[in-house]
Amino acid sequence: MVLTRRQIINGALSIGATSLGGCVFVRPITAFCPDDPRISNPNSPLTIDVHGHVFNGSDIQIERYITLVRARQTPALKDLGEILQEVGWEVAPSGAQEISVLRQVNQRLSAGCGPGEFERLHIAHRNEKYLAGRSALNEALTRVESRRRPAFRSTYGGNAVANAIRSLPTSYPEYHHWQLRRAYRAVGTDAVNAAVAFVMRQFQYRYVNVFDFLTEYSSGSARKIDLLICHCLDFDWPLALGKPTMTPIADQIDVMEQISILTGGRVHCYAPFDPMKQVAYDLGYSTESPESLVQKAILSQGFVGIKIYPPMGFAPAGNAHMKPGFWNRKWLPAPMHRPDFGRRLDDVLARLYSWCVANGVPIMAHTSPSEGPCSDFENLTASDYWWAVPGGLTVNFGHFGDTEIAPDNLSRALAYWKLMGRSGSHGANFYADAAYLTEALKEPVKLTEALRRLFQMAQGKTSPALAQRLMYGSDWEMLVIEGSASESYLSNFEQIFSNLDRDASLGAQGKLSARFFGINAANYLSLRAGSAARARLDAFYAARGVPTPQWAQKVNALPPLVA
């Protein structure tokens, strides 16, 4: 739909109460409108990215994440963690600051949207926060070096981290060009440079991250991202001893509601559910109920699903059977050391699953044995734990069990495929995504053959063909850690599936690429007209004055559902 000048002028902010206090609903900003050819094509095939992130450093415990999680893989990052402890994260926009900026942007554009006007604002905000982040990192490094000189640079990691920070260019355009010249790899100095690039993302406005993603992934790709599903994260209890982030989860939800409106429905979100925090709330140790937050987000704020993160320290089911003392870890708060903690985790997860089944709400779970603070917790991503969840639950197995899928490494993916059932059986609504499959960046030919073999093997009498359940996902902005090559993730997958489309033996019941990039996600998210999920979104758009998004028009044109 092409928006008129009247719709542009009527896009001024309308007042609405949120937990941020006095915040507003943001009408779609039409200078970067839903039919902008840079990010949109009404004639391109439906493309949905089911797995993305646009958070910033006020939304997650970035220092704890780098120190407790990423440094387990790359020990040199412990030195980066020390610097991040010195950073004043008030530089990263809070939820209230982001809403204020969105109001300013809308005010600037309410009298009319001249050519490139939104782009000028977007670029100015991006450069402002890039410079602020660069300054914050350099100042923090100076303090650490002064305190530990010359010890800090005497180690390989300290020297690599210091060089990466001191080398940051003086403007964002120079920085982006500098990134494109580098080819990061997940080893040594390159891993440090990539981690610093990820940290620089954490100083940005969330709306800047959104439009950077949309423009980067649309460049050089025949497909355009019609719908991006972003996932909020809640690591307050698993990583931060119960201390909330600078922008609390409730405020993050409010901000992402506004961004859904800002983008004209091109971006929707999953609310985070941490069962550890829910147990803490039930016991009186936390004032915030994840259950209440996710239900409000789904029913009235345009959110479309719920995100859980097992490698932070819980299985999807069966926690009561863990060995005694399993949660007695030094980084976990004392209330989690109690002997009945596993049973309580199972209880709150069972309540969540029942509500999701009753309301037609999908779940996404991180299923790769990675991104946890210890190996014991990462092992909780094993597929066997999912046999005990309710059979009617709708689930996306994020990363399809492993981010390293290769022809000789298919066992975890096949184990997750075996969980998927046909209509009427357990797992009838189980899916998986291809987010952060690093071989797509490093060895796309190798990944093509791995996926071909996987599709050929994953066809059975009791399980549906994998071709009908695997979905496209990127895991941007986490993928930024892989370096500048991450910008080619979508285009590389386009080429991979262009090759696979020629093989009629893979079980797609139609064009495999159409399934992978759009149809399977539309089925998983229940986006077709008449579903409870679609009804919630249609009501959300009507209440906020958002025209029918392009993704909805494309979904409406899909042939009847083929399971």
What do these predicted ranges mean?
Residues 224-374, 436:
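Active-site gating/metal-coordination segments in enzymes
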Residues 28-34, 394-563:
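H/E-rich (His + Asp/Glu) clusters that bind or coordinate divalent metals
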Residues 246, 280-297, 318-321, 373-389, ...:
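Distinct, well-ordered alpha-helical segments
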Residues 216-223, 253-265, 292-302, 357, ...:
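Acidic (Asp/Glu)-rich catalytic clusters
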Residues 1-2, 7-27:
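N-terminal export signals
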Residues 8-9, 24-251:
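An N-terminally biased module of ancient metal coordination in phosphate/nucleic-acid-related enzymes
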Residues 47-57, 364-367, 397-400:
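Histidine-centered catalytic micro-motifs
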